[in-house]
Amino acid sequence: MNSTEYIRLCLVKRNNMSVAELAEKTGQTRQNLSNKMQRNEWKQAELEKIAAALDADLDIRFIDHATDEPII
């Protein structure tokens, strides 16, 4: 699962929050956020804003390809 897919799942878990609502909460336009989601290119600062908008903490982990488990 890539970062954008994970963000979309989180939006569903947060009472079906829309991309427009997330964009507003992160201080950007819906179009700008949609473009970032299409490219699936995120800076850590952007992910931190999204986490804050979702009332969550950002947890970055490396996942082993063979086992699909976190390395640490």
Annotated model-derived regions:
Residues 18, 43-46:
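Residues that mark the N-terminal boundary/hinge immediately upstream of a DNA-recognition element
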Residues 12, 38-42:
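Residue-level detection of the helix-turn-helix DNA-binding "recognition helix"
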Residues 1-21:
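A short, Lys/Arg-rich alpha-helix, primarily the initiator
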Residues 34-35, 48:
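Key DNA-contacting residues within the recognition helix of helix-turn-helix
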